[in-house]
């Protein structure tokens, strides 16, 4: 698939950009910093993503503010820290009463106001609510095809993950309805046939792009793939072909989907008019061992504030506008809303944003205005505030806590058995020389360097000022759960949850 779209790159580089550009935002799930070939994995089969990296701008220091699904997705779409919106602690469940508050302004709403045709394919995980109140159509998306939460939030022991009949690994969440596939607010299938899901999303994406072109308007597509979240699945062409087992097969299908999306853009003659941005929601779920991803040389993974949890691969691709290369500038998923709004000529919402405009960095006219990053625990509170702060090359951990998602690694600091620990003084790392956070500069047998002492004072001040200014929004998760809010294809059926069963045809 990659050959079809890469052949047009030379032509695309000479094309004038549409004003505003089309935007394709691809968001992977539980993907580690070291999982792509372009980030050094020796055996990953990711030719399309590697081509994006070769033809675009590859970030080495791109972060998410929280290493967990729901809060990370909220940050991406709003440019705001999840604690401001009440999206804590943990993640939203299928029966949660809460969700992304309707007064929050999403990237889709910003771009829709600028005339974009907006759509989301894939994973939502920002709430369902009463009568679907929190679903994408109520947050600025004109079209939605996807699962409203994570595909393991329902029983999966009877589902097929790899054709022709390989069952899904594990049993996932019991006592819940089967996972639903929604088209806008309607149930398409419950459960969907997982091996055919990615192809359906690609077809949906192609239709959205085509319709936008016919309507003479730009498109914004948020392609939120379920890959590579557990339990992994893939279509017919991928099982056993990756060399990395089920995880690699899932990653291989994600890469092929990227190739298919780029082919669709190329077929429409829009490569020079389309900005593509790829990243992921959090680091790998290392507890899954061979069924989880790889954080490379970084410490820990999902659920922690160590680098393996919060540093992500990120690629920006726009032929003729974004010069190929590598940037070591600091950047965050929080920055995408103000950046893409600037490139689209759209007005920013009149609300406190935590993101900054990276368009000068992307277009080669300046550097990143971001110098500081604040990282929250997946289970934050106002007493402790941020767990870690990065400023320039230095990062300080004021609190650390392991996570079940990062169990089974060789490092006990990552494990769920590692309790919440306050560090006084904080752990201090020079990430320019020690990205693996192995050598605490304040734990030296020799005299601590004056530069390190100055750095920790600055980081302590940054944390104190930031915590003092931050106001947590009322917790959406604290609203509790109502089993009747779970999506059901037969709303009045009994007995629940088993009666909510409207499976689609399996080839």
UniProtKB/Swiss-Prot annotation:
GO terms for cellular component: endoplasmic reticulum; lysosome. It comes from the Eukaryota. PROSITE patterns: SULFATASE_1, SULFATASE_2. One of its GO terms (biological process) is lipid metabolic process. Transmembrane segments: none annotated. The active site is at 69 (nucleophile), 125. It is found in: Endoplasmic reticulum; Lysosome. InterPro entries: Alkaline_phosphatase_core_sf (IPR017850), Sulfatase (IPR050738), Sulfatase_CS (IPR024607), Sulfatase_N (IPR000917). This is Arylsulfatase A. The lineage of its organism: Eukaryota, Metazoa, Chordata, Craniata, Vertebrata. The gene is ARSA.
């Amino acid at each position: 698939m990659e050959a079809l779209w890469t052949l047009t790159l030379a032509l695309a580089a000479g094309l004038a950009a549409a004003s505003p550009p089309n935007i394709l935002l691809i968001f992977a799930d539980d993907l580690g910093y070291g999982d792509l070939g372009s980030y050094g994995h020796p055996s990953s089969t990711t030719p399309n993503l590697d081509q994006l990296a070769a033809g675009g701008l590859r970030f080495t220091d791109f972060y998410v503010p929280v290493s967990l699904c729901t809060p990370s997705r909220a940050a991406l779409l709003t440019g705001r820290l999840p604690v401001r919106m009440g999206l804590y602690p943990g993640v939203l469940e299928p029966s949660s009463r809460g969700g992304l508050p309707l007064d929050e302004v999403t990237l889709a709403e910003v771009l829709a106001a600028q005339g974009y045709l907006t759509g989301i394919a894939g994973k939502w995980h920002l709430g369902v609510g009463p009568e679907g109140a929190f679903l994408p159509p109520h947050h600025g998306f004109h079209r939605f095809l996807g699962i409203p939460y994570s595909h393991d939030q329902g029983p999966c022991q009877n589902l097929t993950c790899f054709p022709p009949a390989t069952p899904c690994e594990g049993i996932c969440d019991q006592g819940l309805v089967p996972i639903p596939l929604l088209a806008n607010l309607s149930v398409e299938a419950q459960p969907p046939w997982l091996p055919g899901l990615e192809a359906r999303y690609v077809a949906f994406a192609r239709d959205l792009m085509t319709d936008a072109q016919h309507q003479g308007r730009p498109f914004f597509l948020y392609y939120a793939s379920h890959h590579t979240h557990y339990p992994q699945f893939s279509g017919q062409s991928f099982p056993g072909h990756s060399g990395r087992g089920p995880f690699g097969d899932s990653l291989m299908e994600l890469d092929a989907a990227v190739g298919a999306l780029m082919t669709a853009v190329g077929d429409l003659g829009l490569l020079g008019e389309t900005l593509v941005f790829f990243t992921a929601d959090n680091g790998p779920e290392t507890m899954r061992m061979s069924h989880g991803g790889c954080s490379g040389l970084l410490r820990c993974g999902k659920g922690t504030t160590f680098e393996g949890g919060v540093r992500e691969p990120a690629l920006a691709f726009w032929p003729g506008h974004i010069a190929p290369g590598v940037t070591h500038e600091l950047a965050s998923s929080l920055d995408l809303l103000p950046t893409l709004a600037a490139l689209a000529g759209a007005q920013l919402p009149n609300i406190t944003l935590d993101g900054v405009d990276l368009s000068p960095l992307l277009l080669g006219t300046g550097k990143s205005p971001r110098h500081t990053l604040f990282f929250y625990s997946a289970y934050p509170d106002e007493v402790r505030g941020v767990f870690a702060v990065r400023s320039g090359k230095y990062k300080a951990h004021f609190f650390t806590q392991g996570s079940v998602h990062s169990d089974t690694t060789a490092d006990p600091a990552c494990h769920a058995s590692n309790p919440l620990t306050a560090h006084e003084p904080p752990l201090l790392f020079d990430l320019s020389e020690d990205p693996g956070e192995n050598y605490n500069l304040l734990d030296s047998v020799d005299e601590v360097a004056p530069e390190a002492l100055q750095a920790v004072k600055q980081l302590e001040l940054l944390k104190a000022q930031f915590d003092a200014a931050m106001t947590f929004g009322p917790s959406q998760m604290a609203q509790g759960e109502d089993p009747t809010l779970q999506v059901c294809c037969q709303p009045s059926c009994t007995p629940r949850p088993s009666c909510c069963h409207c499976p689609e045809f399996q080839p």
